[in-house]
Design a protein with these regions (language model features):
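Extracellular/periplasmic carbohydrate-active domains that bind, remodel
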Residues: 1-216
């Protein structure tokens, strides 16, 4: 399954900047708080595969390539299994591979990643979307995966609803930029607890606050 990648993302952002030009000018202070002037227009980029309120889904043996944003996104979903897949999105801004978001019982194994951002990003909503709805991501299992390019396995930064019971093992993140990372903005809220990492190789381990992606 392939999409237009960076070319499609650039076209969508350019069109949305024109569509929102009056709004962006009126809300210049909000734009200044974002990662860059393309952040808000970039929100409309589609996921390659999006699952909303889904149950009991198995994704097996696919190559997911060059989504304009995240490649597989599961939100408010339960019991999602993904295995023996390849995620390819080098050069795509925010080109995450596999993103469970306010979802439970999600399992990922035997997959390869060469992504433009996080290989895996475990999320639970951003700001009010997360802390008012209050649905954590929980019981997330990732094993026997390899990242050859991209940022590695991440918890956050959209995690206002909380993240708990994450188990990661037998993963090779040697060639990833971040290795294993826990990140949030200083005012985001939420929590991370019950994370286990074992028998992995990683370029580094990061636990930190980040200054971007704070709008919402």
């Amino acid at each position: 399954i392939a999409s237009g990648g960076r070319e499609l993302a650039e076209k969508i952002i350019t069109d949305e900047q024109e569509h929102l030009k009056d709004y962006l000018a009126e809300h210049a202070a909000l734009v200044a708080e974002c990662e860059n002037e393309r952040t808000i227009p970039g929100r409309v980029r589609p996921r390659l595969i999006n699952m909303s309120n889904c149950r009991n889904v198995w994704v097996h043996g696919l190559t997911l390539k060059n989504g304009a944003s995240w490649n597989q996104h599961m939100i408010y979903s339960d019991n999602i299994t993904t295995d023996h897949c390849r995620f390819v999105s080098e050069g795509v801004w925010n080109g995450d591979g596999w993103d469970p978001d306010s979802s439970t019982n999600c399992t990922l194994f035997a997959c390869e990643f060469a992504t433009g951002d996080d290989a895996v990003a475990i999320k639970s909503g951003k700001n009010p979307e997360g802390n008012k709805i209050g649905r954590p991501s929980a019981h997330i299992y990732v094993f026997d995966c390899r990242s050859t390019a991209g940022h590695g396995i991440c918890l956050g930064s959209e995690m206002s609803g909380g993240i708990e019971d994450v188990q990661i093992w037998d993963c090779d993140l040697t060639n990833s930029w971040s290795g294993i990372e826990i990140k949030a903005t200083p005012k985001r809220g939420g929590y991370v607890r019950g994370v286990s990492v074992r028998d992995c190789t990683a370029s580094r381990l990061l636990v930190h606050a980040v200054p971007y992606n704070d709008d919402g």
